Swiss-Prot record:
NAD(+) binds at residues 246-251. Very low levels in lung and liver. GO terms for molecular function: 3-chloroallyl aldehyde dehydrogenase activity; aldehyde dehydrogenase (NAD+) activity; benzaldehyde dehydrogenase (NAD+) activity; identical protein binding; NAD binding. Transmembrane segments: none annotated. Its EC number is 1.2.1.3. GO terms for cellular component: cytoplasm. The record marks 170 as: Transition state stabilizer. The modification Phosphoserine is found at residue 413. Induction: By phenobarbital. Belongs to the aldehyde dehydrogenase family. It is found in: Cytoplasm. It comes from Rattus norvegicus (Rat). This is Aldehyde dehydrogenase, cytosolic 1. The lineage of its organism: Eukaryota, Metazoa, Chordata, Craniata, Vertebrata.
Length: 501
């Protein structure tokens, strides 16, 4: 049977003009109260795309007031039928489909994503996610409980209230949709702070939210820096929940701020150093490709990157050879250009961090198989890099690199590799490649990770809960559990004259 044909990918928009650079509050566009703006950089060219209004605490306060007003008892949003909330989310998905090429172009230009990926993956996944959450809107319900005594008892799942949502730069559109979709389906109101590197798709989505017909104040977007706008959200006394995707270091600060303020609910999806284990009986071609994509996709800028690759001793040399051969096939350049398969890192800081970790690998004795340096003279590009003979104590084996760098380590036994795989403060994801069903179940059960992929990698789905163990965070996004993260569970017990079964 032949595989289905890939859908046609249109050309990106030429000379895209950025329409929305202001703060979005109450369905209106505002200048920052401090009068400041910040530059948004194209990471492939290092040129300024535009300047965006820089929100800080005062702007967050303004957005919170709007969101709180929209959440008041008796407001249009609170009295709206749940099914109508779903209709609004579906309308937003339709508008995204209409403007899909524009969104993909913007995501590629601002976030450095390969345009084909931005069109076929980022926008497609986002549209499907919105439709998924739309379907949940009128299916969030409680239970009746046969409690003791002459009492009628039931539970209600109610929206938490005003939610702060802090978006990372590595998936600005997808994470925007994952967060607002779950929150809005339950009836919450939101203040979104996109990453300062990548605010453009969030601001454009704000215009579509208004066009779709969401009431004023339901969705507010405040671009700004983490140390100001992000900190204001985390510590705000009138925000009921904060959801953050980003580094473990910042996640700790957010949880601390939530605890020191009003003990707001917190969902964190943080860093990872995910193990990928390849046993000798695995389908070698498939394992090489999945492991490769697991660490090189989007220039390695993915939280679930398969950044600790454990390969069984008997196939190690051949696996390394094939991995190097695969890494050398990349064509680097502007991600908007056709034929390009690797784009830039997000900014100068991340670029320097990756190169520093590559140098540490060389100095600590890992064998550099290919790559190992900067590519080109302009843009934040890093050569696809593969290290072999990596040991567990090396920095490249312990620290999150967030770049196109593959570390390949050797193991001898199942007990050894499980112990080594779990020897990390992180626990976001893991991969296992084997044809032995018993081994697959044994290893996947033993791994301390929120998601374990068997004979595949990066197969995320909006229907499935996603989140981390240990220092990779707490709470879940997507799936039924991801929806319930945006609800409070209330028990109501009524005294009645007589209870009958």
């Amino acid at each position: 049977m032949s595989s289905p044909a890939q859908p046609a990918v249109p050309a990106p928009l030429a000379n895209l003009k950025i329409q929305h650079t202001k703060i979005f509050i109450n369905n209106e566009w505002h200048n920052s109260l401090n009068g400041k703006k910040f530059p948004v950089i194209n990471p492939a060219t290092e040129e300024v795309i535009c300047h965006v209004e820089e929100g800080d605490k005062a702007d967050v306060d303004k957005a919170v007031k709007a969101a709180r007003q929209a959440f008041q008892i008796g407001s249009p949003w609170r009295t709206m039928d749940a099914s109508e909330r779903g209709c609004l989310l579906n309308k937003l998905a339709d508008l995204m489909e209409r403007d899909r090429v524009l969104l993909a172009t913007m995501e590629s230009m601002n976030a450095g994503k390969i345009f084909t990926h931005a069109y076929l993956l980022d926008t497609e996944v986002s549209i499907k996610a919105l439709k998924y959450f739309a379907g949940w809107a009128d299916k969030i319900h409680g239970q009746t409980i046969p409690s003791d005594g002459d009492v009628f008892t039931y539970t209600r799942r109610e929206p938490i209230g005003v939610c702060g949502q802090i978006i990372p730069w590595n998936g600005p559109l997808i994470l925007f949709i994952w967060k607002i979709g779950a929150a809005l389906s339950c009836g919450n109101t939101v203040i979104v702070k996109p990453a300062e590197q990548t605010p453009l798709t969030a601001l454009y989505m704000a215009s579509l939210i208004k066009e779709a017909g969401f009431p004023p104040g339901v969705v507010n977007v405040v671009p700004g820096y983490g140390s100001t706008a992000g900190a204001a959200i985390s510590s705000h006394m009138d925000i009921d929940k904060v959801s953050f995707t980003g580094s473990t270091e910042v996640g700790k600060l957010i949880k601390e701020a939530a605890g020191k303020s009003n003990l707001k609910r917190v969902t964190l999806e943080l860093g990872g150093k995910s193990p990928c284990i390849v046993f000798a009986d695995a389908d070698l071609d498939s394992a090489v490709e999945f492991a490769h994509q697991g660490v090189f996709f989007h220039q390695g800028q993915i939280c679930v990157a398969a950044s600790r690759l454990f390969v069984e001793e008997s196939i190690y040399d051949e696996f390394v050879r094939r991995s190097v051969e695969r890494a050398k096939k990349y064509v680097l350049g502007n991600p908007l250009d056709s034929g390009i398969s690797q784009g830039p890192q997000i900014d100068k800081e991340q670029h320097a961090k990756i190169l520093d970790l590559i140098e540490s690998g060389k100095k600590e004795g890992a064998k550099l198989e290919c790559g190992g340096g900067r590519w080109g003279n302009k843009g934040f590009f890093v050569q696809p890099t593969v290290f072999s003979n990596v040991t567990d104590e090396m920095r490249i084996a312990k620290e999150e690199i967030f770049g196109p760098v593959q570390q390949i380590m050797k193991f001898k036994s199942i007990d050894e590799v499980i112990k080594r795989a779990n020897n990390t403060p992180y626990g976001l994801a893991a991969g296992v490649f084997t044809k032995d069903l018993d081994r697959a179940i044994t290893v996947s059960s033993a791994l301390q990770a929120g998601t374990v992929w068997v004979n595949c990698y990066l197969t995320l789905s909006v229907q499935c809960p996603f989140g981390g163990f240990k220092m990779s965070g707490n709470g879940r996004e997507m799936g039924e559990q991801g929806v319930y993260e945006y609800t409070e569970l209330k028990t109501v017990a009524m005294k009645i004259s007589q209870k009958n079964s």
